[in-house]
């Protein structure tokens, strides 16, 4: 049972920050800075690999490991960068230290280091997992100040201002986090976690949860997870060019779609009801038939893709989506298999309404920093309830007893380092996947209503937005549509695939000499902007050179630095069938 937290022991805990400066090849470090709010220190060397004992990274860690501290060490985007340098150095230079890494996808969410002999402990965290934005934007938002300007990064290691640049990064991050923690505790009534999602959950339980939330059965959990789909993202038409009859392409976006969905009654307590009851709140495993139509709305997982096809298939569907598909004349239920239904309750309205008021710019107490915090908290909570039960932890040089008792599996490492992975299945009281599944289903229903309204005039959609030449009714309330580019309309667009498109607007953007929006998720180089012609190159079948920085597993395998590869947009199995004129139709499926 998920119970509210008392919040009696809430307090802001001390912390420290660090930052590194590297050469542009991202393989050698020459400066490391550290700040705790009172004292600032830095270490300098020639540009050297982090595993070199004379490197600035090794100097910093040597000092840090000689000084036990309970303060977590924060670096912004450290889980993808700074902590990876630290890990490479620790593996090769400190054989007496054990390391425990909690990964989040390929990033380091948390890295714990312990001295086997003295049992001193240190903890490295990534502040970007709590505040997901660039340090420049966060500095402007929280402190009204950014990073040092007009720096040539390629020559920074030769620039006398490198010391000023590093110190500003350290002090800026510390000041941002200090203000963040103060606002979180004093204004939001929150409690800090190691990520935005864990912080949102702790905040909800501390100040907004009014009743315990019961656990659900394994049967209900299985069906809820099977009916938990992500957002809908796909193109419907390839290209838009403005003309006399159709002057602009609109981008309509749902105002705070998931917070809007959270204000609805949520599935809480499992009901002892069997059979086919789509009028209830729950999830139904059934075989359906979706007739030919331009815009089917029921989700289908196949070939590692989320499709919205026509045809016949078996799946687990939320009752809200099933009702909408049947009411619109698209779907027929051919066979019922099993189901789970829930008693509902309004459990999030207080949380949403309170935080959303912080985003009201007409409020005389409006503050940009707390507005940003409220937005993060509103969008981070619902997914936490759908967390997976299987977790992985990476261990470097674990004790023999831990290796045996935790049934760790060895990871191959040419470095000759004992590396193991621990996989555990742990059910926590907050794992209530029916809540996450229901909220995302309500969001897809809201998007589907818009897609059905614009029909064949839809060009593209992405979770909570629709690009279309048709008009949708707009408003400022939660869940209503807004025209995202009403002040700078789109007069040309090309949609290649999900998250890969280019838009041309009527005017240049503020503080920019360009009127182009260029998106190609997964095709950029590390810390570099996309080339201006990226989408056109991908559309012609060419590949782009992409790069990524080594992650924790790569370091364990002996790889470090920037890794380059060629990547192209695979169009052999798109979510829809596209025709030569740029129009499309849904795919047909037929499976049980």
What are these regions (language model features)?
Residues 1-6:
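Polybasic, low-complexity terminal segments and linkers that are predominantly intrinsically disordered
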């Amino acid at each position: 049972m998920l119970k509210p937290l008392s919040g009696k022991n809430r307090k802001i805990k001390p912390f420290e920050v660090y930052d590194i400066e590297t050469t542009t090849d991202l393989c050698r470090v020459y400066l490391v800075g550290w700040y705790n709010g009172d004292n600032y220190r830095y270490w300098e060397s020639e540009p050297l690999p982090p595993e070199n004992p004379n490197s600035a990274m090794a100097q910093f860690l040597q000092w840090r490991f000689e000084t036990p501290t309970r303060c977590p060490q924060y670096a912004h985007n450290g889980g993808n960068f700074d902590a990876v340098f630290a890990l490479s150095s620790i593996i090769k230079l400190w054989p007496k230290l054990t390391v425990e890494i909690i990964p989040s996808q390929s990033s380091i969410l948390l890295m714990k280091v312990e001295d086997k002999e003295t049992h001193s402990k240190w903890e490295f965290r990534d502040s970007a997992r709590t505040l997901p934005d660039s340090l420049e934007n966060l500095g402007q938002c929280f402190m009204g100040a950014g990073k040092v300007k007009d720096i040539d990064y390629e020559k920074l290691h030769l620039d006398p201002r490198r010391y000023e640049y590093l110190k500003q990064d350290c002090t800026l991050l510390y000041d941002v986090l200090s203000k963040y923690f103060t606002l979180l505790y004093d204004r939001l009534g929150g409690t800090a976690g190691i990520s935005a999602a864990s912080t949102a959950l702790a905040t909800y339980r501390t100040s907004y949860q009014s009743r315990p939330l019961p656990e659900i059965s394994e049967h209900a959990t299985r069906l809820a997870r099977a009916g938990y789909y992500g957002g809908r993202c796909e193109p419907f038409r390839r290209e838009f060019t403005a003309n006399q009859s159709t002057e602009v392409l609109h981008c309509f976006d749902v105002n705070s779609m998931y917070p809007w969905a959270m204000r609805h009654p949520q599935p809480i307590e499992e009901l002892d009801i069997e059979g086919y009851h789509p009028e209830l709140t729950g999830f139904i495993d059934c075989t359906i038939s979706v007739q030919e139509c331009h815009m089917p709305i029921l989700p289908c997982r196949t070939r590692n893709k989320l499709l919205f096809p026509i045809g016949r298939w078996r799946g687990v569907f939320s009752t809200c989506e099933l009702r909408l598909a049947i009411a619109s004349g698209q779907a027929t239920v051919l066979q019922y298999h099993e189901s789970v239904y829930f008693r509902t309750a309004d459990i999030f309205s207080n949380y949403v309404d309170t935080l959303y008021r912080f985003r009201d710019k007409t409020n005389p107490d409006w503050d940009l920093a707390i507005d940003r915090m409220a937005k993060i908290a509103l969008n981070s909570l619902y997914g936490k309830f759908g967390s997976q039960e299987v977790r992985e932890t990476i261990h470097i040089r674990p004790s023999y007893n831990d290796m045996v008792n935790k049934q760790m599996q060895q990871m191959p490492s040419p470095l000759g380092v004992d590396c193991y992975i621990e996989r555990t299945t742990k059910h926590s009281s907050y794992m209530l996947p029916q809540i996450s599944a229901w909220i995302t289903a309500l969001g897809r229903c809201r998007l589907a209503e818009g897609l059905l309204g614009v029909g064949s005039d839809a060009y593209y959609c992405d979770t909570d937005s629709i690009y279309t030449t048709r008009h949708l009714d707009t408003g400022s309330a939660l869940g209503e549509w807004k025209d995202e580019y009403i002040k700078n309309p789109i007069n040309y667009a090309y949609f290649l695939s999900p998250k890969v498109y280019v838009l041309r607007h009527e005017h240049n953007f503020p503080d920019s000499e360009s009127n182009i929006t260029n998106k190609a998720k997964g095709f950029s180089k590390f810390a570099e902007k996309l080339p201006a012609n990226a989408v056109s190159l991908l559309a012609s079948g060419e590949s782009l050179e992409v790069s990524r920085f080594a992650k924790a597993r790569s370091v364990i395998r002996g790889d470090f630095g920037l890794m380059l590869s060629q990547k192209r947009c695979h169009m052999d199995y798109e979510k829809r069938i596209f025709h030569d004129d740029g129009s499309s139709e849904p795919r047909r499926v037929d499976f049980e």
